[in-house]
Amino acid sequence: MKDFIMPRTFPCPRCGQPSVWEGNESRPFCSERCKLIDLGAWASEEYKLKTQDAPTSGKGQHSDDYED
């Protein structure tokens, strides 16, 4: 009797639904739809890292604004 091996699954990072890893062209997402939704979120800057802004000295913040 052959043992049936369950395919490895993981939660989709976008919707959380279980998704099979092997043979999934959209991995780590469960579908092309979740993949494109996530791409759109990156493009519209929905994902941001929290940072602590450094105090400004009153000058502009761009490197072009500083004198050599």
Curated annotation (Swiss-Prot):
GO terms for biological process: regulation of DNA-templated transcription. GO terms for molecular function: DNA topoisomerase type II (double strand cut, ATP-hydrolyzing) inhibitor activity; zinc ion binding. Residues 48-68 are annotated as: Disordered. Its cofactor is Zn(2+). Zn(2+) binds at C12, C15, C30, C34. It comes from the Bacteria. The keyword Metal-binding applies. Interacts with GyrB. Inhibits all the catalytic activities of DNA gyrase by preventing its interaction with DNA. Acts by binding directly to the C-terminal domain of GyrB, which probably disrupts DNA binding by the gyrase. This is DNA gyrase inhibitor YacG. The lineage of its organism: Bacteria, Pseudomonadati, Pseudomonadota, Gammaproteobacteria, Moraxellales. The gene is yacG.
